[in-house]
């Protein structure tokens, strides 16, 4: 953060950044934030203005938590990837003798994590202003105005390839 004054107008600017991986391999959050505060005073402090703008952008990738239970129960002697599983991006997958998917079998937990793309992006801006004016002729009498604005926009998507075993049950 940075504080100071320009032509007797005090200000404070702050920026923030976070990029953190989740507990599961594909989970992640990236957050970018910024804020600006202005606090000018005029006419021997009879007019006070406090204004602020805060903004943020949050990008999330949510890991497939089904992979936790599957990892606990999945056969540990099977490889994560193996030859002959091109249809499943090389991930070992339980198949029937005819080569079709065993729909009741556990899905490879790494396949669950790496083929599940669940993301959200949220942008938000909050702006506020307070204007307070003490009347010169009667300083106990004040006019006060508070205004605010809050804007938020979000978008999310979930993508699972059609060939993924978790799509077979749909």
Set out the residue ranges of the language-model regions.
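Outer-envelope beta-barrel architecture signal
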Residues: 7-11, 45-49, 139-143
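Acidic/polar N-terminal loop/beta-strand segments that form early-domain functional surfaces
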Residues: 5, 14-16, 134, 146-148, ...
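Residue-level signature of outer-membrane beta-barrel architecture
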Residues: 4-6, 36, 40-42, 131-135
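Short strand-turn segments of transmembrane beta-barrel domains in outer membranes
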Residues: 1, 11, 15-27
């Amino acid at each position: 953060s940075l504080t100071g004054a320009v032509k007797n107008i005090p200000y404070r600017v702050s920026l923030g950044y976070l990029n953190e991986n989740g507990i599961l391999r594909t989970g992640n959050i990236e957050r970018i934030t910024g804020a600006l505060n202005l606090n000018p005073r005029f006419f021997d402090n009879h007019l006070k203005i406090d204004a602020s703008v805060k903004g943020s952008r949050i990008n999330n990738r949510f890991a497939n938590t089904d992979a936790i239970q599957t990892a606990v129960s999945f056969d540990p002697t099977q490889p994560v990837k193996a030859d002959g599983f091109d249809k499943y991006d090389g991930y070992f997958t339980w198949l029937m003798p005819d080569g079709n998917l065993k729909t009741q079998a556990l899905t490879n937990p790494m396949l669950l994590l790496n083929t599940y793309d669940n993301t959200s992006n949220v942008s938000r801006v909050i702006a506020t202003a307070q204007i307070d004016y003490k009347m010169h002729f009667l300083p106990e009498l004040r006019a006060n105005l508070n205004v605010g604005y809050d804007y938020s926009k979000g978008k999310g998507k979930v993508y699972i390839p059609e060939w993924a075993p978790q799509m077979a049950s749909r």
